[in-house]
Structures are given as C-alpha cells and as structure tokens.
A protein has these predicted regions:
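Amphipathic, charged alpha-helical segments and their helix-to-coil junctions
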Residues: 1-161
Length: 161
C-alpha cells in the first residue's frame, strides 16, 4: 500500500488561493468592524446628547419619548445590521472553505492518477504522531496547486483593493 501525507499548514501559508482569500476575508472583516464601530459611536453620541438635553429640560415629555423611541430603533437597526453582516461573512467564509477543499481534492485526484497512492493523509498539528519525511508530498502538492490556480477577475480586483 502506497501512502503519502500533506502538511495542511504549508498549504494554508503557501497556496496562492489561500493567501488571496485570506486577504479578501481579512479586509472584509475589517470593513465590517469599522462600519459597526462607526455606527455604534454615532449612536452613543446621539444617546449622550439626548441625555444631556433631557437633564437640561430641553424637551417636552412627548419629544423626549419620540427621540428615545428613535434611538431605540437605531439600536435595533444596528443589531440587525450586525447580525446580517456576520451571517454574510460566515456564508462567504464557508463558501471559501468549500472551494478550498474542492480545489485540493480535485488537484489530488488528478495528481494521484500518475502517483497511484492508496492513501493521502492530511497532517495538521499533531494528528499524525509519526510520519517519515519520505512520505511527505507537501511541496509537490503546493507547487501543483499554485501552478493550476487561476484567480477570477473578481477575486483579483478584491485583492488589489
């Protein structure tokens, strides 16, 4: 039986597909955080301003209730936005992980037509207690993955942003 293994960490750090998508997801995550933080600061500022004016008796009771209801709606909208953006980000991350797994499996299927391995294992952390380096095909796999990788125009544009 012919066996080989691939270092997952090396694929994650050297495969261009991973690098590109990691950068895109990192930028997207940062944009989400920045958007939510800015809206949170604006809401806090509006709430502080409201409190100050309430203490100065600048509003009638009806005005204060209307403004407070508006602030509560803004807070609810912010929470809904947070939930929506988090869900969208998770969906995109899941899609990336699926595409990554599919690209690796597709490459290994083609690669293995010539190599004829019975088993190709993934080595991540210490999931393999011992493996002789002679069975390590990581460099070949990473080189082959990178050679086959053709980023979409959409991805290239997102990476360059």
């Amino acid at each position: 039986m012919k066996i080989a293994y691939v270092e997952v960490d090396a694929i994650m750090s050297q495969y261009k597909f991973c690098k590109d998508y990691s950068l895109v997801l990192q930028k997207k995550g940062q944009n989400i955080q920045n958007t939510l933080a800015a809206k949170q600061r604006a809401l806090q500022s509006a709430a502080a301003n409201f409190q100050q004016k309430v203490q100065q008796n600048a509003y009638t009771r009806e005005q204060a209730e209307a403004i407070q209801a508006g602030l509560q709606k803004q807070n609810n909208d912010l929470q809904a936005l947070n939930q929506r953006l988090t869900t969208e980000f998770q969906t995109e991350t899941d899609s990336y992980n699926t595409a990554l797994r599919d690209s690796i499996q597709h490459f290994l299927a083609v690669y293995n037509k010539d190599k004829k391995y019975s088993l190709i294992l993934s080595k991540a952390g210490d999931n393999l207690l011992y493996a002789d380096k002679a069975f390590d095909i990581t460099n070949e796999v990473v080189a082959g993955l990178n050679k086959a990788y053709k980023p979409s125009e959409k991805l290239e544009a997102a990476v360059k942003k």
